[in-house]
Amino acid sequence: DAGLTQDPWHFDTTTPSYGPGASMLDRLPANAPRQQVLPDEYRKASDEELQQRISDAKQRLGSKLLILGHFYQRDEIIKHADFVGDSFQLAKNATERPDADHIVFCGVHFMAETADILSTPEQSVTLPNLSAGCSMADMANIDQVQECWDQLGEICGTQPDSDGLQQIIPVTYMNSSAALKAFCGRNGGIVCTSSNAHAVLEWAFARGKRVLFFPDQHLGRNTARAMGIPLSEMPLWDPFKAQG
């Protein structure tokens, strides 16, 4: 993708985007947040001036500021990060600095939301670019999941069976919105990472007859296959088709 070598200001737009390298087939949510164009004083500043302004701000704020940088960020961002890692690691890092009043998460929506969930009420979490979305997290939104849940409830029922097993246990991947994580919490479900997906599915099947896994169909399918569950028992619900 030629966009990977273009200057960052090329993507300074109010139009939501997954950025350079993203698949043209990825659907952006209609209600995706829009980023305001940055003031000219930043756009016209040299790289050296911008770097100095960041360094000065860090020095001035000291321990009150925590900058988290995802692995995918450019080097000129990573150099200022207090912690660098994947989304799960950075979410844990956010809890290690309760003295930080301001957490700047250089990542995408769901990452900043997760840090906000784990932070204290006194801390603020800032996402520098509001249009920084994740196509994986956007593969399922709360309205789609709720519709699927309601339809499955009509088919499978909503009451536990005679053994006390729930009809369906919702499981969401870490790369999902706060709304989906909250949905799982309300409905007896759980959040998983790629490394503990197997253990989480074992936990879920010990408590329920079925699992509704979202938004990453491949993580759910591959983990279930490794557990010996046949593909014939893994239907895919498509929100863009009647009755899924």
Would you name each region that the model predicts?
Residues 3-244:
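The feature marks the mature, well-folded catalytic cores of soluble enzymes
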